[in-house]
UniProtKB/Swiss-Prot annotation:
This is tRNA modification GTPase MnmE. The keyword GTP-binding applies. InterPro entries: G_TrmE, GTP-bd, GTP-bd_TrmE_N, GTPase_MnmE, MnmE_dom2, MnmE_helical, P-loop_NTPase, Small_GTP-bd. Its cofactor is K(+). One of its GO terms (biological process) is tRNA wobble uridine modification. Pfam families: MMR_HSR1, MnmE_helical, TrmE_N. GTP binds at residues 229-234, 248-254, 273-276. The gene is mnmE. Binds 1 potassium ion per subunit. Its main location: cytoplasm. Belongs to the TRAFAC class TrmE-Era-EngA-EngB-Septin-like GTPase superfamily. TrmE GTPase family. K(+) binds at N229, T248, I250, T253.
Amino acid sequence: MSHALPIAAIATAPGRGGIGVVRVSGPRLDAYIRALLGRDLTPRHAHYLPFLAEDGERIDEGIAIYFQGPHSYTGEDVLELQGHGGPAVLKRLLARCLEAGRSLGMRLAEPGEFTRRAFLNDRMDLAQAEAVADLIEASSEAAARGAMASLSGEFSQRINDLSGRIVHLRMLVEATLDFPEEEIDFLEKYQARPTLDGLRQDLDTLIAQARQGIILREGLHVVLAGQPNVGKSSLLNALAGDDIAIVTPIAGTTRDKVVQEIFIDGVPLHIVDTAGLRETEDTVESIGIARTWKEIERADLILHLQDATAPGDILDVDITARLPARTPVLAVFNKIDLLTSTAQLAENSIGISAKQGLGLEELRARLLQMAGWNPGAESPWLARERHLHALQAARDHLDIAAEHASHDDRVLDLFAEELRLSHESLSSITGKFTSDDLLGEIFSSFCIGK
């Protein structure tokens, strides 16, 4: 168990609410609780009592619960005071908790410090700790379910299973190296090659699932780009199901970006409506157009809206030529309801009517397809970019190990080293091999009371 100094913080969100919670964590809080509340508390029981200032003035009244370590969130002794959720009351209650713990060196908790202590005290691994933040930040039911799956250990179990198999394979290599006089090829005897192939296949599956988990967690930055009056704002409103952006027949109405988050099959998409792209003498509109190009540069996907009644417009050709080659682009021809005959759209484009709602379901499906979302392979857990990088690194090291294993004159010490590096990459996901700098970066993104 950790022997760090005790910490305290308000654990509920800022603002007014029916209930507010102040949380304290530290080693051996029995005497502290007695001094703060004037009585002992039975662990894991709710006690209704007054919360008093040092001079006996009643600050509030509510429920006190004592969780004795190591059977607590942080693995240390934890005290939670549940009172009324007014900011002034909670600030006074927190100040009283810190005052009562002054002799113990109690201080205000840093962001994420309660969860960091839970990690350091082996109450959860690093992937589970990240899932706590993801659950708090989840903006859809699908994301919340994925975060809960990670928090319950489903992702970590997959990592630990792969790690265990790599360690076993490495043990066979070391045995072959350490006992050459036995004339036993442990790698051949225990079918090391099929084991290695199976590991690579399972890692491929895990990498694909991680990509799905990243999309579910982070969503995509989708920019609507095109000339003025091609229907970008109308499309934003149609996708959002609300009048988010102003729509008029006047060219140049949108002069700054408008961002709206929508969900398609639980996947968050951050749709950005932008100023129409054209040559203009208007200073304000020019600023908006410059911002549009900046948004285009940072987009995950670009919807290039064009007027279906004027295909092949020279300005659309110029815009297409300027769009970044590294970013997926979908040409969307709007106003198909105004066409008098069946028009032949450009290959790999889509026709819609934002005003009439035509083609929007196909557009939603194409957005998910271009994002790489596969509903049939939905990740049961959320993932982060660092998880994907670690999984890919582990896979790369196994590929190199396979090359060493395939040679007649196998270089077993290099084979063993690649297995070690693969195992280390996987272990960085759960925090068994993780730098202090990375831990600081992860936990600093938490709210203070968590």
